[in-house]
């Protein structure tokens, strides 16, 4: 079998803690995931912060040390409750707070990317909602200031959600510190099986 030479900056990993790990006895200590990933030939993990950044600083520092020891790249998937496109200013403020805390968590972990879904269309045209999202995101990034942590906006898998490839690329091209995260499974679902 011919092995491909993979450039050193390309990593392969998992999102969250896979069943193949969590069903093992050593999974009682979630920190064992880093050695397990290395043992199965993977070198990256996206930590899921579905309900927000709840990890203690001590646990974050421990995960960072374990990830470095096993050469595992860490990234974070931000909470689905971060809704910068919401028409409700109170929800946007809560979202800004959660996203700021996610950046703090990423810094402790040594993660250099935070992945974020742009959210619902709220029954409005994508152009209108994506404009509100981009304006709120631009204000957030200005408030955040200089950072080496990139915010990666991910494509959505449902047509009723904001997150087309074009929208993601437009936002990433216009806001400093923001990049695209193209999830091909989501693109395939969004296009109703359109990827060949």
Q: What is the meaning of each model-derived region?
A:
Residues 44-48, 76-79, 104-108, 145-146, ...:
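Short C-terminal domain-edge/linker segments immediately following a structured domain
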Residues 68, 85-180, 189:
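Active-site acidic/histidine proton-transfer and metal-coordination neighborhood
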Residues 1-101:
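N-terminal pre-domain/capping segments
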């Amino acid at each position: 079998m011919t092995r491909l030479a993979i450039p050193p900056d390309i990593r392969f990993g998992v999102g969250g803690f896979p069943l193949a790990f969590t069903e093992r006895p050593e999974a009682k200590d979630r920190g064992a995931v880093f050695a397990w990933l290395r043992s199965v030939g993977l070198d990256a993990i996206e930590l899921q912060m579905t309900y927000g950044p709840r990890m203690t600083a001590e646990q974050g520092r421990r995960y960072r040390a374990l990830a470095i020891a096993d050469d595992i790249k860490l990234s974070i998937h931000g909470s689905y409750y971060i809704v910068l496109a919401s028409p409700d200013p109170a929800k946007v403020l809560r979202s800004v707070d959660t996203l700021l805390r996610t950046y703090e968590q990423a810094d402790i972990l040594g993660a250099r990317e935070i992945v974020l879904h742009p959210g619902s269309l709220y029954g409005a045209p994508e152009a209108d909602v994506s404009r509100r999202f981009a304006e709120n995101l631009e204000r957030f990034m200005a408030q955040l200031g200089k950072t080496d942590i990139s915010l990666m906006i991910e494509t959505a898998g449902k047509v009723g959600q904001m997150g087309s490839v074009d929208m993601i690329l437009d936002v990433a091209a216009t806001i400093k510190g923001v990049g695209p995260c193209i999830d091909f499974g989501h693109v395939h679902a969004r296009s109703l099986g359109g990827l060949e």
